[in-house]
Amino acid sequence: MFNFKLSQQVLKNSTKSIMPILKKPFSTSHAKGDLFKYQSQLPKLPVPTLEETASKYLKTVEPFLNQEQLESTKAKVAEFVRPGGAGEALQARLNNFAADKDNWLAEFWDDYAYMSYRDPVVPYVSYFFSHKDVKNIIGQDQLLKATLIAYYTIEFQEKVLDESLDPEVIKGNPFCMNAFKYMFNNSRVPAEGSDITQHYNGEENQFFVVIYKNNFYKVPTHKNGQRLTKGEIYSYLQEIKNDATPKGLGLGALTSLNRDEWLSAYNNLLKSPINEASLGSIFASSFVIALDSNNPVTIEEKSKNCWHGDGQNRFFDKPLEFFVSANGNSGFLGEHSRMDATPTVQLNNTIYKQILETNPNDLIVEIGSSAPRFGNAEILPFDINPTTRANIKDAIAKFDATIAAHDEEIFQHYGYGKGLIKKFKVSPDAYVQLLMQLAYFKYTGKIRPTYESAATRKFLKGRTETGRTVSNESKKFVETWSDPNASSADKVATFQAAAKQHVAYLSAAADGKGVDRHLFGLKQMIQPGEPIPEIFTDPIFSYSQTWYISSSQVPSEFFQSWGWSQVIDDGFGLAYLINNDWIHVHISCKRGNGLQSDHLKWYLVDSANEMKDVLTKGLLTDAKPKL
């Protein structure tokens, strides 16, 4: 798609210094490691039976229906699964379709869930991590922090390229590592109807991109086949900070547009070979680091900067984008289309652990004694015509309006965490899910469909399944705990039953035995012109997939916040962390629909305190000592 020979010629003719083209691979060894050694052994994603999905489906919709509605839905499901019914035919087609596929769902899912989605990726799709503070000079110095992020990210990339990174194995089950193929040198690119993924050879594109003052710079990752030293990386970043080039117009804001609008602006940009070459470099880069000029202090300010910033000193189509503010605060944003959060959590955990272990005095000495670097950072030139200038102005205005329409709060509860929760002999994930359901019920008085992401990476090319976290048991739990006349014993009993059911459903979902992906697959098997089975036209079908709460957690001791947007206008996005001594929930919702994030935050505090009090007394009270 992109003319790289032209790109090189443009840069040779520019007034900026040029960087030698690197041709040597990262390593002279052709031996590969174990990163993908389990791939051929991974099972394929199963196709559940009609009967098990139908049974689960009815149980998941029951909390939302009165008896008459439930009987109507049962009749439609029974008609669907009966011998000779539509479900039987669709199931046979799906089984046949799946027979020769690595993963039957992957054939549809990336396009359906991500690539054909036309709303802006930020704030609606991408997710952010806000890194915890580093309590030394590294955490206060923008260039020191950015140097280490770049250095350890390049090191991680080398392990992916030579496959020496250890494959992930959880409780004896190897996980699919396919997503790591799309981690580096990759970008989402706007296209008609459905976006595409543009992937580049990492050994032929040994550079990353730095964004500073809305300008884009190309920085090498290797010299003569060797990773740059920390001192060399620092020197490049320092050069960029000292560059007198005026602040850019904010071309990165174009990536915040609706995808069709971004496509139109993108096609206009491509009319210039200069733009085509520069965009090609950004797309092909290993990753992006944005050096911001702001100084976020509170956890809310840090989260907002990582989630969206001002929308200009960014390039939202890259799957790996790091941010470092002027005061050293850092974070990460992940474009979601080819990778879920678990691979990028591993990346961030790995590099941040190394940053925390770095001795700042040794780092300063190492940088000060570094040999001179071998070239200069290249600024990527852009030819901004009047149409592009107007498009950028329009993108900035729309981005500001979109962000202003969002209401964001942070529930950062230092009262307790998984250390205490485990003493209740319950899954910490189930506990926090019930905490959020209780808070939502106290706030709205309603029980609404709730989504939790369940990883299916134990299967080849597995990504996620829906965890339907609302159940008859969780309904009983929130109703009992909201009843002033309920006894503590009843509260404990309903809590335990709801937690048990939660674990059971999430475990089944992780085993590929959820409801939503199977029903989705069956629906894809309907041929043009065929009647739509009533199970799919039943109002409860769409309602039960309307996520008034969209939730997920990630495992990290190195984040202080993470999050994303709500998925419907009158819903909440709830991203949570469960650390040993604290619980975090990032709350987002749309303004103007009667919901307020600070109100839900208050009910989260209230519910967290109540659950701790009741369960401590009901489950942890020591037996009286014998006389």
From Swiss-Prot:
**GO biological process terms held by the UniProt record:** carnitine metabolic process; fatty acid metabolic process
Question: Which residues of this protein are catalytic?
Answer: H336 (proton acceptor)
Query: SUPFAM superfamilies per the record?
Result: CoA-dependent acyltransferases
User: Annotated motif Microbody targeting signal: location in the chain?
Assistant: 625-627
**E.C. designation(s):** 2.3.1.7
Q: Name one GO molecular function term.
A: carnitine O-acetyltransferase activity
Record localization: Peroxisome; Mitochondrion inner membrane
Q: According to its record, what are the GO cellular component terms?
A: mitochondrial inner membrane; peroxisome
Which keywords describe this protein according to UniProt? Acyltransferase, Fatty acid metabolism, Lipid metabolism, Membrane, Mitochondrion, Mitochondrion inner membrane, Peroxisome, Transferase, Transit peptide, Transport
Q: Tell me what topology the record assigns in the membrane.
A: Peripheral membrane protein
Q: Where does CoA bind?
A: K418, K422, K423, F424, K425, V426, S427, P428, D429, Q553
InterPro entries xrefs: Carn_acyl_trans, CAT-like_dom_sf, Cho/carn_acyl_trans, Cho/carn_acyl_trans_2
Residues annotated as binding (R)-carnitine are Y451, S453, T464
Query: Which reaction is catalysed here?
Result: (R)-carnitine + acetyl-CoA = O-acetyl-(R)-carnitine + CoA
Per the record, the similarity remark reads: Belongs to the carnitine/choline acetyltransferase family.
Briefly state the protein's biological role. Carnitine acetylase is specific for short chain fatty acids. Carnitine acetylase seems to affect the flux through the pyruvate dehydrogenase complex. It may be involved as well in the transport of acetyl-CoA into mitochondria.
Write down what this protein is called: Carnitine O-acetyltransferase, mitochondrial
List the source organism.
Answer: Candida tropicalis
Q: Please state the gene responsible for encoding this protein.
A: CAT2
